[in-house]
């Protein structure tokens, strides 16, 4: 698919030290011939429905804060509808695979975001005299890089069958009831609530 890119100015405001990014510097415009393909139409629909879902979720929070519970509920309900629509178009794009395939897809997307997208946006913002916005792009890029690292570790775990089995005794916790088991492998079933092994994860204390 061929794309042309059109630059626009980057504007930002700050409040209490928080940078508000009001515009991303590039806007893709598809060739007219590409607009007529089913795949491109599905991509446009998926992007639009995904954006609407997030937007309505944000709107619902504002409505709750302002005391409009019914309006918040309507925004939330519509957001769920948009999520269902997005899934429809994403499936049409063959975007959902096995867990291992999905992890590889996610890692690839995160790599693009930090290595190319945010890095490029940061350079452009710096060149155009917006050091604060450049720093914001760089910081978000660092987060996306950590996301890629996490996905790659999970890919490695799945590839060598160490999701539920380790080389030495570790502590496993049931995500359903909180039972903690010690061993090289997670229990096939939780001895307390009987949930399957898939509910176990390594204990991670961050307090």
Where do the PLM segments sit?
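Short, low-complexity, intrinsically disordered N-terminal modules
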Residues: 1-3, 21
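Short, positively charged and aromatic/hydrophobic N-terminal segments
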Residues: 11, 18-26
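Non-heme di-metal
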Residues: 26-207
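Serine residues within intrinsically disordered or low-complexity segments
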Residues: 13-14, 33
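Polybasic, lysine-rich low-complexity intrinsically disordered segments
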Residues: 7-9
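Cysteine-centered motifs
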Residues: 3, 15-16
């Amino acid at each position: 698919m061929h794309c042309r890119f059109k630059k626009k100015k980057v504007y930002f405001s700050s409040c209490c030290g928080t940078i508000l990014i009001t515009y991303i510097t590039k806007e893709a415009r598809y060739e007219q011939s590409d607009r007529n393909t089913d795949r491109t139409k599905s991509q446009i629909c998926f992007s639009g429905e995904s954006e609407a879902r997030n937007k309505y979720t944000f709107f619902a929070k504002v409505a709750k804060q302002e005391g409009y519970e019914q309006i918040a509920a309507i925004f939330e309900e519509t957001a769920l509808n948009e999520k269902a629509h997005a899934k429809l178009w994403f499936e049409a794009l063959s975007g959902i695979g096995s867990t291992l395939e999905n992890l590889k897809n996610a890692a690839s997307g995160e790599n693009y975001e930090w290595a190319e997208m945010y890095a490029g946006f940061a350079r452009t913002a710096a060149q155009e005299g917006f050091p604060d916005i450049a720093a914001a792009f760089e910081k978000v890029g660092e987060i996306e890089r950590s996301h890629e690292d996490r996905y790659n570790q999970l890919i490695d775990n799945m590839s060598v069958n160490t999701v539920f089995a380790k080389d030495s005794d570790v502590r496993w916790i049931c995500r359903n009831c909180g039972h903690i088991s010690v061993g090289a492998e997670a229990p096939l079933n939780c001895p307390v609530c009987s949930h399957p092994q898939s509910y176990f994860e390594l204990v991670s204390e961050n307090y």
